[in-house]
Amino acid sequence: MAVCGRVRRMFRLSAALQLLLLVAAGVQNSHGQGQGLGVNFGPFAGQAGGGNPVGQQPPQLPQLSQQQQQQQPPPQQQQPFPAGGLPARRGGAGPGGTGGGWKLAEEESCREDVTRVCPKHTWSNNLAVLECLQDVREPENEISSDCNHLLWNYKLNLTTDPKFESVAREVCKSTISEIKECAEEPVGKGYMVSCLVDHRGNITEYQCHQYITKMTAIIFSDYRLICGFMDDCKNDINLLKCGSIRLGEKDAHSQGEVVSCLEKGLVKEAEEKEPKIQVSELCKKAILRVAELSSDDFHLDRHLYFACRDDRERFCENTQAGEGRVYKCLFNHKFEESMSEKCREALTTRQKLIAQDYKVSYSLAKSCKSDLKKYRCNVENLPRSREARLSYLLMCLESAVHRGRQVSSECQGEMLDYRRMLMEDFSLSPEIILSCRGEIEHHCSGLHRKGRTLHCLMKVVRGEKGSLGMNCQQALQTLIQETDPGADYRIDRALNEACESVIQTACKHIRSGDPMILSCLMEHLYTEKMVEDCEHRLLELQYFISRDWKLDPVLYRKCQGDASRLCHTHGWNETSELMPPGAVFSCLYRHAYRTEEQGRRLSRECRAEVQRILHQRAMDVKLDPALQDKCLIDLGKWCSEKTETGQELECLQDHLDDLAVECRDIVGNLTELESEDIQIEALLMRACEPIIHNFCHDVADNQIDSGDLMECLIQNKHQKDMNEKCAIGVTHFQLVQMKDFRFSYKFKMACKEDVLKLCPNIKKKVDVVICLSTTVRNDTLQEAKEHRVSLKCRKQLRVEELEMTEDIRLEPDLYEACKSDIKNYCSTVQYGNAQIIECLKENKKQLSTRCHQRVFKLQETEMMDPELDYTLMRVCKQMIKRFCPEADSKTMLQCLKQNKNSELMDPKCKQMITKRQITQNTDYRLNPVLRKACKADIPKFCHGILTKAKDDSELEGQVISCLKLRYADQRLSSDCEDQIRIITQESALDYRLDPQLQLHCSDEIANLCAEEAAAQEQTGQVEECLKVNLLKIRTELCKKEVLNMLKESKADIFVDPVLHTACALDIKHHCAAITPGRGRQMSCLMEALEDKRVRLQPECKKRLNDRIEMWSYAAKVAPADGFSDLAMQVMTSPSKNYILSVISGSICILFLIGLMCGRITKRVTRELKDR
């Protein structure tokens, strides 16, 4: 740019401005367009100053006073006034121009145009006429070329006379004294006014400011009047084809188009990687300086003024010009449907210039001037990149705000406006244009308004519409940091409009613009209050916020100290290769869950914020950068069909063993974290809110969870208030926990040392539980002095064992073995509440061998430790509290059996106890008490049965039947006899407790005793029915079982419930002193029956006689147990003579054969025998 005076400036106005001031001797009130500053000028050009006549060379704008005085007018037209100045005023016309001075309106070449275009009341004021003429653009009101030429020469002649400067010194006296730079300008050179224009923003004196503003408007009407502009941009104008600089080829208004064309060339260059045409550095500075000096009044941007004049009237009619207010108003309405396209384009160009130089925004430069200086965000600190200025300054000031520094409210307001502006229109960010052009054309064409393009690109980044290049993604991330919408959701217009209804309902308690609005929206994600459009926009923005911890202002404010101390982070707008933004949050959450022993923990406030972010990230895997990055392939491979909320993470957890190593580690770490703080699972917490409120509020209120909340949810999983979503979520987490014992936080913390010592290299939780529980059981059975498993681990191990019994899926080995059986026999049964396990038990005889074996093992474990029998514990929970509050877990079932027939016993519990008794009686191994009591008797009397037995299949009551027969013979040990008596008594009351009877007499029971078997309460009626119908039984095995029953009843009256009931009073009267057992009371009753002196109850007498007959019959048909029984049967048989004859004859025949056939062995000599 040419030197205008003794100091070279980035931009100077021509001397015309300074000399124009000379005619002003005061300020008067005028009318119409001249109102406000009533200075009446002599003959000079107006704002619309146009081209020169054809053939005239463009005037060389003066650089020195001598050049100004030597400037000659065009030769084609007579110069209306001398170069030295204006004609003498007629009639002493005052400065207002209302006297008899020279009138522009009276000149012949302009009279017709003034009369046609300008209101009559303005004719006497030259300034008003100039404003009127230069603001004309309609073709029908076009100014004649002669008038344009007059105006141009008028302005040009003014630039040649330096004597008018004194007037400006009078009008701006106090201002000049305040601005030292202007006061030091030499007098009479014309530089002082140019200096005042440079400092127009600092002028507070009203008259001076108005005067300088009006003069600036006049000069800005023609780029050729700007000092040095044409020298600096001449080549660029030709290169960019912005219009000829030859005289006469452009009309008055096209001179603003030249500047506009240069501006477009400047912004286009910034948007191309390899621009074909580059604007020279001098011209760039000139263009930006012109834009800066026109930043306060939109009249000074001639192209924008004419393009937006109608829109200004439509949208900003009541907005007063000055201080950039009209610009801002038009910016706010840029995307209105009724905004003209030419105005929108001009506004966009203006905004792009602001993006390159913040001073092009008057309001931003003025409001933030002191803050920029205070926080050293001045130009000297800027990077050299051409597009970084506005973004750098915004980030510099935002950094100060985030550090808690005080930035003026006016400046913050301006920052908010321009951040919103950048978010609304992607084209204002050169980096987006450069890096995302292909993606925009391919995915987001036609979405150019209200921030929709940026959100479209965000959607692509999230993987919902294709893929995005890394450069584009990085450009988007940078733009999000520059605009910082996390600090105020209103910056993102697309989000603001989409979520307005949600904010008004769900977040109305939070102040508008508060950063917590975004958190509130995240908390209501996937709820009834959330609308779909808001959900999409919110997740699109959160995708980027989650990748840079600084973009969450609340997190940054609460954690910047911890991040600096623990993660070695830098300032808000600084980055580090060693600790990239995405890695900082990972660092924070690793420290958030450290124990006090591990040290270096986060502050309480920061920890709460980290937990908040973790809760939000659990909503969507795409909000967890590390998870999405490492698991992208696995998500596509295993979870492509899992599109519902929260399903993707669950899917990854379900396929944990199949995932790639890096993805498995990430998912494993996240799951381990969830086990410590299940509130991270925000969707699960939302589903379980009623249960938490009613049953777990104490542990939920704890700031440190440590797995207590999940444990509480598991314990209350089957409460009536439990909803399906919560139950499914809790069960799923339990299933995930089975994959690795680390996923059970309390178990891990209680048993990690024991696992390392006793179960090394075991990973799966179920295997760890089996390993530890086996160790505990062995130590207990061997009565070891000291348990190898620590006490705290044993306690938590018990909790884990009990939890695993609730669902067959929590016991993977059993579940895998029985999958096909579940499908075949339990397809209609729901998982949970141990219902599938119970179903398998009921269908045990039909199960596959492998499943049957697993179920038998499970039952054996449950009988040894009834507390592990989930169904029994659930059904009999209240009865256990009533009858067995002090009972040990091992003796729980025994206690319940003893109280089974109590009147206070719950029928459902009684039914369940009976079920377990039936199970126990199928195999002695399922009855630990019997097994221990008969340890010596079983191998002694039932050895043959044991040799045929298999380890994992039932003996169907054979051993117990064997022991019952020995009980009748009174050959058992006392402990074993006591247990068999109890079993015999119970099975006498309920035939279902006798497996052998059920097995062999099922048809007879169905045919002969169907009514008795259908009775709800079994009191021995089926057994009595079989005894009565003994002669009708054809099946030998069934008959044998009934005979055995008769034999057992003879051993003890308690074993015959019908007889015992009938003879209860008689026993009390006649046999009270007799000790029960070994048939003693039965013998007493028999003696009483034979004694004529004793009168028994009729029912007792009848039953006794029936029993005697049955026993007599049984004795006849019962098979011999030994040789003595066999001899007795032969001697009492009616055919005994025949049997004895056959036996004797057989012996005689054998003797005769021996006599006749001789010896069988070979004869040898005596010598050989004696040897």
From Swiss-Prot:
Q: Where is the signal peptide?
A: 1-32
Keywords per UniProt: Cytoplasm, Cytoskeleton, Glycoprotein, Golgi apparatus, Membrane, Phosphoprotein, Repeat, Sialic acid, Signal, Transmembrane, Transmembrane helix
Q: Which domain of life is it from?
A: Eukaryota
Its GO CC terms are: extracellular matrix; Golgi apparatus; Golgi medial cisterna; Golgi membrane; microtubule organizing center
Q: How does it sit in the membrane?
A: Single-pass type I membrane protein
Q: A single Pfam family, by name?
A: Cys_rich_FGFR
* Cytoplasmic side stretches: 1159-1171
What is one Gene Ontology biological process annotated in the Swiss-Prot or TrEMBL record?
A: negative regulation of protein processing
- Cysteines engaged in disulfide bonds, as pairs: none
Modified sites of kind Phosphoserine: 953
Cys-rich GLG1 repeat ranges per the UniProt record: 108-141, 142-204, 207-270, 278-338, 339-405, 406-465, 467-529, 530-596, 601-660, 662-720, 721-780, 788-848, 850-903, 904-971, 972-1027, 1033-1093
Full protein name: Golgi apparatus protein 1
Source organism per entry reads Rattus norvegicus
Q: Lineage of this protein's species?
A: Eukaryota, Metazoa, Chordata, Craniata, Vertebrata
Designated gene of the protein: Glg1
